[in-house]
Amino acid sequence: MRDPVTDFEYPAAWVAACRSPDLLDDVRRGLAVLTASGTVLRRGFSTGTTAAAACKAAILSLACDTVREVDVTLPCGIAVRLAVDGYRGQASCRKDAGDYTADVTGGLEFVAMAAPSLSGGVQFVPGEGIGSFARDTPRHRRGTPAISAPALDCIRRSIDEAVEEADLSGTTVILTIPRGAEVAQKTLNPRVGVHGGISVLGTTGFVEPWDDHMTEGVIDRIARAPGAVVLTTGRLGLRYSRLLFPEHEAILVGNKLEEALRAVEGDAVICGLPGLILKFMNPDVLSGTGCVTVEELSATPLWEETVRRELAAFRARYPRVRVVIVDRDGRIIGEPP
């Protein structure tokens, strides 16, 4: 059995340990994950997926009064159906956190308002409750809505599908998150330079149920690896780890690097984007730099020396761990000599 989201082949022992075989269909479809103990945990939906569903429902409700559910194709390519409440151009969708109990945005309501555009064309307007960048960064200008590229693509695709289905020449859609500013205070946004609301994100469109069960799964995967392992923190890192280290077993560990390293016997590689890796190597890496994020630091003259210093210090502490830092295009930007 293979996870269509991560391409991970579940060991037969995990499948045999599952006491709820009826739930395995959700695992096959990517809607849930299977852990080493046989427990099935539901994936949740990202803020980007929730936003896309609300926008699509608002447009569809212009043509059919009420809308109770919509289909959304996620950035990972999987089509899902979400419950919505749409009526005459306004719709809401509540964020489903799945079995990720620590998701502070779980249950948050996303509201979209749509109106036909007489002049044609499609306009998407991020409104109240969606955060914006308080400072310029290498990828975002000050004041830009905090909506990631995969999430924005998902939203725009859902809007285009709804416009076609509703037979409209165009539309204007305004998306708001009524409690976004309040809930954002419980997230990392205030510390990473995003103000006024939450971020709308979603690399795959799902939220992983990262909890103690997932840690158990990571450790089990490391123990079962037939050879050397490469540990990575995210989806892009997983992709580039497989390309750079095809002979290694690539294992997605999220923010569980410390636990994963303890489970590794022998040599290991850490490969991925700089954010989590540098802060794992040195939680105070930003101290005294005047930067609030690693991405912001990467655009300063301090960057190259900081990367060299932190890699050397980490190598001295963990001589059997090789760290390879890549950018979003897969180029190696940091590696010990």
UniProtKB/Swiss-Prot annotation:
Family: Belongs to the CbiD family.
Entry's Gene Ontology BP terms: anaerobic cobalamin biosynthetic process; methylation
Name assigned to this protein: Cobalt-precorrin-5B C(1)-methyltransferase
Entry keywords, A to Z: Cobalamin biosynthesis, Methyltransferase, S-adenosyl-L-methionine, Transferase
Record has Transferase as a keyword: yes
A Pfam family the protein falls into: CbiD
Alphabetized SUPFAM superfamilies for the sequence: CbiD-like
Lineage: superkingdom: Archaea
Biochemical pathway: Cofactor biosynthesis; adenosylcobalamin biosynthesis; cob(II)yrinate a,c-diamide from sirohydrochlorin (anaerobic route): step 6/10
Signal sequence, renumbered to the chain: none
Gene Ontology molecular functions: cobalt-precorrin-5B C1-methyltransferase activity
Transmembrane segments: none
EC nos: 2.1.1.195
Catalytic activity: Co-precorrin-5B + S-adenosyl-L-methionine = Co-precorrin-6A + S-adenosyl-L-homocysteine
Organism: Methanoculleus marisnigri (strain ATCC 35101 / DSM 1498 / JR1)
InterPro entries for the chain: CbiD, CbiD_sf
